[in-house]
């Protein structure tokens, strides 16, 4: 019997200076969540760390560009059945960071995927479930 895990994650919808989404093409490696899928930059929260501190740290580690905490806008929270790993549970906080200069990034995990907003739907089948959740919240916020 496989023991279920509870993950605590913070990730960001990152938008460049031209309004494009900066997404992570995840490595095709056994053992990582949503291997080969398109994800958001972010990751696991460390003990004693707030979700905002987590997203600042994780995004910096993964894209090599520091985004100050006051530049992150909270998008949506999720707490329930794991979106990306069957049988697990998760709490995830999603943020938005805007006006990020794509030419200053140095992606260290996976590869950078720059997507025009009107092309995102064509990648729907490649998006990790957590990305679909965050993008639906983002689209809903744009309509409000």
Where are these predicted regions, by residue range?
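Active-site-adjacent beta-strand/loop module that shapes the phosphate/pyrophosphate-binding cleft
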Residues: 7, 16-18, 76-104, 134-137
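Conserved Nudix-box catalytic region and its N-terminal flanking loop in Nudix hydrolases
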Residues: 20-61
